[in-house]
């Protein structure tokens, strides 16, 4: 340890820059961890059960073990056949848990599966679940090592190349975007994550209103009988629905372990159970029946910002959770053409939102019949490519035909006085866009936010003068106030980090991890020189000295340049990530072993395809690939004509985009 202290002294004597400081700190951290590990090994050796025990203690242990073995008939009651069956179950459950870990499933969601595994193991070896408690002479030691590792883990970001799924989860945790809640599959969106959603919501809400829709709100609870009215719709959501069956709790007075606890009151059971909304088509079309009478009431367009519940088995923060936030638009039209055009127009709005606000290029297209929304005649989608080569469905719009109108008896009187059925659409995006944002732009250092969606576009870090330099302090404050006013005057979102209890280096590190696009440093020397220092999150490696008089204008120009830089980088990655005209064998070989945890995967495959649900399912089973969409541009251009399906060899009907997806 003395050598370590000497090394630390020498290291901190020669730190020329903040970057080398971080490098030295990381190196010293590894060295200190090595000492900690050596100390842990020495402690473990002293406590190891492999070392000789005192004779009297050996006698007590042997006697206790023999008595337990003799009194445990379960330990010898398993037949060879039963033991083999149990071992097979243990192996299968272990493999399933490992697969979920590779997919980035949270510890909370893994817990019940781990409990099942332990239960199976206890059946195989009953003694493992009934180990004797330590005797009074054995003193329990606090698990300080575990506490330390938890602390280290909370600040550590796994590299993308090491494990892409874990990197994604680390970004969310370290950058304070969200964390697991006590409710299975539900997350707590923290202020920084929520502020990003606010930026998305504000931009999209203006687009929705420009589209002609008005905001409304509909109940969270939907009568089960409503879902039963549209057969395809209920089939699509039945397995994901959370059901409310009682309207009151009561104290359990029956004898048993739960006596005095709360139970659902048997006398408060609902005649028609309520569904926590998975989506709101049924509730909204029930209301449309009251609101639509004449052709003059059409088109009718409403939108709501809300939360929905879909009981997911395998969750991933932002990308797939049991509860999530979204907007859902619902429209009614007099003609099919009007409804289809509305669906396509809204998909264009979603694509522009991703491009202009999030700097994410997307592929627009139609879903295959197997992938359509439950109850829709056509589903349109935007698909984005993540850094690991997997696709992410980022928004959808649906042409519903007349299915919901007929299910809820929604009609209108046309100009000739005849009753006609109504045509419908629905469309939506969710907090999944935050996941897309993370996976598209972020790096191993933390979150990277395009300037237009960043909650804070510029963070200004003032560097205070010496304590007794009152003149310097006043000059710095005046320059700071002017700089901030100039930046805000240009419409920028600015944060001043003047915390006096946090070192400047720690501030830089924190805001870099949170993805703030531009940091401005302002110290006494800068003020005297009439300058400040710019440091961009990405795009420009070096710091830039800028005149205070030009700082606001330079910041606007630099942030616009950064927005374009991120979009172009994502476009290049998308273009490079699409494999053209591959054979099925080539795609299968590349995708069947591709996992979400791998970085720089094979990407997407644009191939000629004959629409066939049976073959589509076979491909999904063989290499886990799905049709992400039939891309609009290449299919409208007839690129599939004259080509053979890459799977069946028959005449193609579409160009299909295949790939693995989150």
Language-model segment annotations:
Residues 2-25, 30-32, 40-44, 61-662:
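NTP/phosphate- and nucleic-acid-binding module
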Residues 47-49:
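Residue-level detector of alpha-helical hydrophobic segments embedded in or interacting with membranes
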């Amino acid at each position: 340890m003395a050598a370590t202290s000497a090394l630390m002294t020498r290291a901190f004597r020669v730190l020329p820059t903040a970057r080398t400081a971080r490098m030295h700190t990381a190196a010293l951290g590894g060295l200190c961890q090595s000492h900690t590990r050596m100390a842990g090994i020495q402690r473990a050796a002293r406590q190891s059960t492999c070392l000789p025990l005192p004779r009297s203690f050996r006698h007590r242990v042997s006697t206790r073990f023999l008595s337990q073995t003799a009194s445990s008939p379960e330990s010898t009651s398993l037949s060879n056949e039963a033991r083999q069956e149990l071992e097979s179950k243990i192996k299968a459950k272990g493999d399933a848990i490992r697969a979920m870990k590779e997919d980035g499933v949270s510890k909370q969601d893994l817990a019940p599966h781990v409990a099942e595994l332990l239960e199976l193991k206890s059946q195989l070896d009953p003694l493992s679940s009934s180990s004797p408690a330590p005797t009074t002479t054995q003193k329990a030691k606090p698990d300080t090592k575990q506490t330390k590792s938890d602390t280290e883990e909370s600040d550590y970001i796994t590299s993308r190349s090491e494990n892409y799924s874990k990197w994604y989860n680390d970004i969310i945790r370290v950058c304070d975007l969200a964390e697991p809640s006590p409710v299975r599959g539900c997350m707590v969106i923290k202020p920084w994550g929520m502020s990003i959603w606010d930026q998305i919501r504000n931009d999209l809400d203006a687009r929705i209103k420009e589209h002609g829709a008005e905001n409304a709100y509909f109940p969270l609870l939907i009568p089960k009988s409503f879902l039963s009215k549209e057969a395809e719709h209920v089939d699509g959501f039945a397995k994901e629905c959370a059901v409310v069956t009682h309207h009151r709790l009561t104290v359990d007075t029956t004898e048993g372990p739960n006596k005095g606890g709360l139970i659902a009151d048997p006398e408060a059971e609902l005649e028609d159970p309520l569904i926590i909304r998975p989506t709101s088509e049924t509730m909204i079309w029930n209301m449309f029946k009251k609101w639509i009478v004449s052709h003059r009431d059409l088109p009718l367009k409403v939108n709501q910002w809300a939360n929905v519940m879909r009981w997911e088995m395998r969750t991933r923060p932002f990308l797939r959770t049991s509860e999530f936030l979204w907007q859902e638009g619902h429209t009614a039209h007099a003609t099919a053409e009007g409804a289809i055009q509305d669906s396509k127009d809204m998909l264009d709005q979603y694509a522009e939102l991703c491009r202009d606000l999030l700097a994410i290029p997307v592929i627009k297209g139609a879903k295959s019949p197997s992938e359509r929304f439950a109850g829709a005649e056509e589903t349109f989608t935007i698909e984005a490519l993540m850094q690991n080569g997997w696709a992410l469905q980022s928004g959808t719009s649906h042409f519903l035909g007349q299915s919901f109108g007929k299910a809820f008896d929604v009609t209108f009187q046309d100009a000739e006085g005849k009753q006609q059925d109504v045509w419908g659409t629905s469309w939506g995006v969710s907090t999944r866009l935050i996941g897309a944002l993370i996976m598209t732009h972020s790096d191993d250092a933390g979150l990277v936010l395009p300037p237009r969606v960043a909650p804070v576009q510029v963070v200004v870090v003032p560097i205070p003068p010496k304590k007794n330099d009152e003149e310097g302090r006043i000059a710095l404050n005046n320059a700071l106030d002017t700089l901030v006013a100039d930046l805000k005057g240009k419409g920028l979102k600015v944060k001043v980090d003047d915390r006096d209890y946090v070192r400047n280096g720690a501030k830089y590190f924190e805001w870099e991890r949170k993805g703030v696009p531009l940091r401005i440093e302002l110290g006494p020397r800068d003020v005297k020189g009439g300058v400040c220092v710019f440091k961009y999150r990405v795009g420009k490696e070096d710091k830039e000295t800028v005149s205070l008089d030009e700082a606001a204008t330079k910041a606007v120009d630099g942030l616009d340049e950064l927005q374009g830089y991120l979009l172009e980088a994502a476009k290049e990655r998308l273009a490079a990530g699409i494999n053209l005209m591959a054979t099925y064998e080539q795609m299968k070989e590349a995708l069947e072993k591709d996992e979400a945890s791998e970085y720089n995967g094979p990407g997407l495959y644009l191939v000629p395809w004959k629409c066939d649900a049976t073959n589509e399912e076979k491909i999904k089973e063989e290499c886990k690939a799905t049709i992400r969409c039939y891309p609009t541009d290449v299919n409208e251009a007839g690129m599939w004509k004259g080509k053979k399906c890459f799977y069946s060899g028959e005449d193609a009907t579409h160009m299909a985009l295949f790939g693995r997806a989150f």
